[in-house]
Amino acid sequence: MKEATKYIHAGAEPDPSTGAIMTPIYQTSTYVQEAPGKNKGYEYARSQNPTRTALEKAFAEIENAKYGLAFSSGVAATDAVIKLLAPGDEVVCGNDMYGGTYRLFTKVFEKFGIKFIYVDTTNISSISKAITGKTKLVWLETPTNPLMNITDIAAVAAITKPENILLAVDNTFASPYLQNPIDLGADIVMHSVTKYLGGHSDVIQGSLMMNSLELRDKLYFIQKSCGAVPGPMDCFLVLRGIKTLHVRMKAHCENGAKIAHWLRKHPKIGKVFWPGFEDHPGYTIAKKQMRDFGGMLSFVLKNDSVEEAMRVLSSTKLFSLAESLGGVESLINHPASMTHASIPKEERIKNGLTDSLIRLSVGIEDADDLIDDLATAIG
């Protein structure tokens, strides 16, 4: 089945009682049972909800997985994965990850005896060297947020599989339209569904996809026991958003490429971080494991001035200064003070995330209008 067809029909079945083509919003907290223990597959909405069931089926289908689980946020989905571990276990992860993930790892889970080892995951040997007998999980972002670094998922899977180490990939920046980590050997795929899957900046949600039934059952137990589940209205909004994923992502990619190339030629721009440049260190891998290069990019001004960066951030009109990404509207962001503020400055600087870095989530407006907006702001 072609991608466009898959996204439109994923998780979709006409409502058996009415024939409604769209999954109904089952806005209920509980379900009537015929007798104790005798129900119609649903007993309490924290455990199951028909709208969520349809969405979880869609999640699996769009990532070429067997199972999907929906969570109340991307961080909640990440939280569930780490709860598979025990005190003394170790996790190898990237040194330029999303700030919210870093905060969860360092401020929440380290005190429970789980050790997180941060390495440059673009260097596969760095991952190999960091693995010990206590390593239970490798956590990847690719492309990374916000420096757009690329990690070879298949190469990492070749290391983790023989050692029975779980490989989880945060696929938020790519979306299933561009990359399917399970096809490349990942055990778990995580999405901040808030971003491209929702696509309209109107829902907070996360997801996990996997092929292993044993892994699915463990994660479902955590999902239902800890209760970080989305409501049916949120599930409905994401079901609707997924139907246009292919149309939106094509436009994101086209606009992203135009803006990346325009920025690179601008005399006031120092460096542009975007994996579609042929001289990007991860270009060859990105071309192999991704279908296109996406609508996310970052840049620094040539003078590397924090003051000038702040002026640009406050001067755009079409690019809204805001957290998040992946919506139809374009956003501009200052990672050092916004999405990655929880990472200590010395760690950020060491890993290349400077105070002057600007991140763009390129929307699906007319590319020329977006370029005009940036041109005016940059000056």
Model-flagged regions — what are they?
Residues H9, Y67-K268, F273:
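Conserved PLP-enzyme active-site core in the AAT-like
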Residues K115-I117, G133-K136, R248, N303, ...:
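PLP-dependent enzyme catalytic core of the Aspartate aminotransferase-like
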Residues A257-K317, L321-G326, I343-I349:
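Conserved small-domain helix->loop->beta segment predominantly found in fold-type I
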Residues T30-D79, K83-L84, G100-K107:
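Conserved N-terminal alpha-helix of the aminotransferase class I/II PLP-enzyme fold
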Residues M1-Y42:
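N-terminal glycine-rich, Lys/His-bearing helix-loop that initiates the first secondary-structure elements
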Residues I25-Y26, E34-A54, A58-E61, L331-S356:
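Glycine-rich phosphate/pyrophosphate-binding loop
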Residues M209, S298-V300, S361-G363:
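Short hydrophobic/aromatic beta-strand micro-patches
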Residues K2-A4, A10, A228, K271, ...:
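Positively charged, small/polar-rich N-terminal and surface patches that mediate targeting and assembly
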